[in-house]
């Protein structure tokens, strides 16, 4: 009875289920569903395992980097200290070796110099020294300069005025045109003869004929005019720089009449003794303004 009850109970259960033995389509559906469930479980398990492995690798990398940083922090000061110590040792070695190297260099230099000297002494001197020929120097023509002393302000005040000089210059031009047609004016400058007592006491000195004599002459008057004309030129130049127009005077016209032009050659007066007479040739200007 019990077995029948048990059998009936199983059969009743099977009857209650929607799947029956006579429906194969239901069985295929159930199998497909079970396969999908198994596949899903396998994939999820695999993904979980991969995730765990990646986390483990990350943790290992983090641990390794942390250990490397700790090692670097410990090694850096040690490396710095070691490098400093090695540098100091190398510098000390170089300092110790430097005097020896300099001595070796000096010794090598001296040996090279000695060998060069020995070779030069052994070799005979074949080249004969050529006789030195004196080079002739260019002869410069000796010219005697005309010396003229600039008169002081006191002498200028004593001398004649510019109008007198102008009159004398015009007279000179007239006499030269009438008397001497060759273009030269002969002027005699006579120096006073000193007494015997003065001549015995003072030694003779060379004296140029253009120096001022005891008496007034045309040469001294012209020298005074040249000094005054230079002063007037300086004053005119200063006035032009200041922006003012210099006054026109008769000094320019007199300079054209009294002073020879640049085209005429200069005259050379030879040095003479105090007790001699000299003749000075002064060429007149090309155009004389009256």
Swiss-Prot record:
Top-level lineage group: Eukaryota
Stretches for region Disordered: 89-157, 172-217, 261-290
Residue stretches of biased makeup (Polar residues): 172-183, 193-202
Cysteines joined through disulfide linkages: none
Composition skew (Low complexity), residue ranges: 207-217, 274-290
Compositionally biased tracts (Basic and acidic residues): 106-124, 142-152
Name of the featured protein: Uncharacterized protein ZK353.4
């Amino acid at each position: 009875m019990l077995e029948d009850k048990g059998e009936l109970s199983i059969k009743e259960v099977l009857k209650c289920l929607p799947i029956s033995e006579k429906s194969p389509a239901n069985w295929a559906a159930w199998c497909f569903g079970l396969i999908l469930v198994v596949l899903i479980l396998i994939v999820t398990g695999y993904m979980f395992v991969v995730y765990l492995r990646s986390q483990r690798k990350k943790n290992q990398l983090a641990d390794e980097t942390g250990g490397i940083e700790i090692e670097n922090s410990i090694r850096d000061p040690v490396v710095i200290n070691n490098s400093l110590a090695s540098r100091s040792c190398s510098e000390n070695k170089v300092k110790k070796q430097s005097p020896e190297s300099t001595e070796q260099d000096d010794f090598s230099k001296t040996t090279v110099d000695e060998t060069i000297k020995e070779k030069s002494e052994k070799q005979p001197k074949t080249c004969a020294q050529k006789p030195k020929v004196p080079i002739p120097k260019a002869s410069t023509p000796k010219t005697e300069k005309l010396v003229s002393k600039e008169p002081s302000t006191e002498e200028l005040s004593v001398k004649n005025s510019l109008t007198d000089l102008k009159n004398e210059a015009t007279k000179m031009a007239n006499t030269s045109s009438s008397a001497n047609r060759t273009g030269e004016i002969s002027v005699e400058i006579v120096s006073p003869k000193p007494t015997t007592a003065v001549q015995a006491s003072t030694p003779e000195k060379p004296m140029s004929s253009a120096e001022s004599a005891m008496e007034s002459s045309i040469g001294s008057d012209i020298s005074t005019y040249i000094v005054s004309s230079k002063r007037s030129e300086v004053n005119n130049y200063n006035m032009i720089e200041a922006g003012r127009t210099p006054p026109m005077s008769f000094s320019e016209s007199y300079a054209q009449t009294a002073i020879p032009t640049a085209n005429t050659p200069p005259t050379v007066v030879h040095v003479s003794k105090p007790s001699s007479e000299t003749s000075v040739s002064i060429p007149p200007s090309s155009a004389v303004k009256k």
